[in-house]
Amino acid sequence: DAPAVRPMFAALVATSDLFKASVEDLDWLYPGRSYQDVAHEWLEQGAALVAVTLGGDGAWACTRRQQTTVAPCPVVVADTIGAGDAFTAGLLCALAEADLLGAGHRADLRAIDDPTLTRVLAFAARVAALTCTRPGADPPTRSETHQARRQSGVT
């Protein structure tokens, strides 16, 4: 029941620096609203960064200062199970590598520049894409993640 869940989301957003959702999640939770509109509302409620996975259309993220979209990574899809979790793990990994996580870095996350935001989002999308190349929720290996990091420009 989406109307019953919305207040819980509002409470979570108000206390979260980072919020990730899929476009499917948002279509269910806020029917008839664009993901961009919902994300900007979440920023107003307190989130520093909102990331939205767009399925086969890539991913999008925004802060109050900017927004960026990354194209999907071209892979042969075996299974999409675990892709969202892998995206979130990749996003957190890349943000940690950029020293943008934690209460002490909240202002830095809010001020993330466009090149960094794009690199972080591209890395998360690549990790999700790697997960889709094999059946089951089978995230990439450490070696594959390092290769993805190099390919997406995250150091």
Residue ranges of predicted features:
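Conserved beta-alpha-beta core of the PfkB/ribokinase-like small-molecule kinase fold
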Residues: 1-40, 47, 57-58
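Conserved phosphate-binding/catalytic region of the ribokinase-like
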Residues: 31-155
